Amino acid sequence: MSIVQLYDITQIKSFIKHSNYESASYLYKLPQQYNEIDVLITDAIESPGVFSIKENDSIKAIILSFAYDKNKFKVIGPFVADNYVLSVETFETLFKTMTSNQPDDAVFNFSFEEGIQQYKPLMKVIQASYNFTDYYIEARTRLEEDMHQPNIIPYHKGFYRAFSKLHTTTFKYQAQSPQDIMDSLDDHHHLFLFVSEGLLKGYLYLEIDSQQSIAEIKYFSSHVDYRLKGIAFELLAYALQYAFDNFDIRKVYFKIRNKNNKLIERFNGLGFHINYEYIKFKFESRNVKDQTIPE
């Protein structure tokens, strides 16, 4: 067995296409369009590299990652050849090879679909720690009772500064900017504000896809000074009612990031339920000692 760095995009794509991906992290980050996946693989080849396990001149597994911030990476893989058993020891060697030349403050992130993928032994062997869970939650019916919520209003430009600060503080990576949200507002894009005592205490951004007959609560948050006061739940209830009352849709859904499953279950009271969830892990080089690569 040998660890070999790969540079041929066609070879990498071909292996991934025919591989077993039951333990592949961030599988949903692989673009469906060929030109987009070429860009991702090209970036990965440049840094930190695409690495493979080879036996008898045949590729048995591949792992790669891409940067989303300085020294922060999302790991895609491992992709494993059919009829090949990837041991935890071999995975550890493969992963250490990819990370060995990175600075001490480098962070490698993993994401696996709970209940579908196998990941625990791999995360344990490299000493990756649990980070959080992304829950994808949906509702398919409106609330049975109408809820009067006088504190919730459509967006008003007088609250732009407060909204902008709250949004950028809450969503730091790969999110629409406050101005992008403003520019998008129309019959199918709505921004609702929770205002009390003249202060913005929360907001929710709703996006309607009429072709797919679905609505996404793309962003929602409450101000840190007013957490645990039910503001988020009032916004969600309002959006749920608004979407089903005004559009012909099948479901309303949103994603929420949390470590507390009990908190997530509170959404059941609004008719939401967990559709699927992604478990997130992170590997921090500085927290793991003796990262020498086995000969």
Where are each of the predicted segments found?
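Short amphipathic alpha-helix that is part of the acyltransferase structural core
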Residues: 1-34, 145-175, 293-295
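Active-site rim helix/loop that mediates acceptor-substrate recognition in acyltransferases
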Residues: 26-50, 172-197
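Conserved donor-binding loop and adjoining core beta-sheet/short helix segment
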Residues: 34-93, 204-224
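A structural microfeature
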Residues: 61, 132, 200-202, 276
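Acyl-donor-binding surface of acyltransferase catalytic domains
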Residues: 83-148, 278-286
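Conserved acetyl-CoA-binding loop-helix of GNAT-fold acetyltransferases
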Residues: 84-100, 222, 228-241, 265, ...
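Conserved hydrophobic beta-strand within the GNAT/NAT acetyltransferase core sheet
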Residues: 108-112, 217, 252-256
